[in-house]
């Protein structure tokens, strides 16, 4: 789904990832600007529950970092786990109250949530190819040229919605 126009500068960028359609949409406010093909985690059905499950998380997140030294070309860090993931993890006794508190505090401050709990972490939008098969450990992969456009135009703090 490579469009030949580069992603323009935007006033109010946001990202919507539709897992069933295998797409990443970039909006400026309510206006759809561009759609990209993506690959997901190797077990994409359902919401991410824990580290190593191969699922791509669902919910409301934000970009908390950008990495130009990624082993998958370039990457944008997605703020998984969010407060809802933390609540479910606490109820299921997957994480401790201390870990829950740290996640909620980070999310409330729009910082990087802890990436080392049993909920998992290190969810990125990165290069390496959309291809025909889902191959990541839960990340969202694009072709390198497409992730370069996102990397250049999407700032830290941009909202990311991941839908089933």
Predicted feature residues:
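N-terminal post-signal-peptidase region of extra-cytosolic proteins
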Residues: 1-14, 20, 40-65, 144-148
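A generic fold-level signal
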Residues: 9-10, 19, 55, 71, ...
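A short, compositionally biased
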Residues: 17-23, 155
């Amino acid at each position: 789904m490579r469009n030949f126009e580069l992603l323009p500068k935007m006033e109010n960028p946001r990202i919507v990832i539709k897992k069933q359609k295998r797409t990443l949409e970039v909006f400026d406010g309510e206006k759809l600007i561009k759609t990209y093909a993506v690959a997901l985690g190797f077990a994409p059905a359902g919401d991410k529950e824990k580290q190593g499950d191969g699922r791509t998380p669902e919910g409301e997140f934000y970009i908390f970092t950008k990495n130009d030294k990624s082993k998958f070309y370039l990457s944008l860090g997605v703020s998984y786990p969010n407060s809802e993931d933390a609540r479910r993890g606490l109820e299921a006794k997957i994480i401790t109250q201390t870990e829950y508190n740290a996640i909620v505090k980070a999310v409330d401050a729009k910082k990087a949530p802890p990436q080392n709990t049993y909920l998992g972490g290190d969810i990125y939008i990165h290069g390496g190819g959309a291809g025909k098969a889902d191959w990541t450990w839960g990340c969202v992969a694009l072709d390198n040229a497409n992730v370069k456009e996102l990397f250049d135009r999407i700032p830290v703090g941009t909202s990311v919605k991941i839908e089933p």
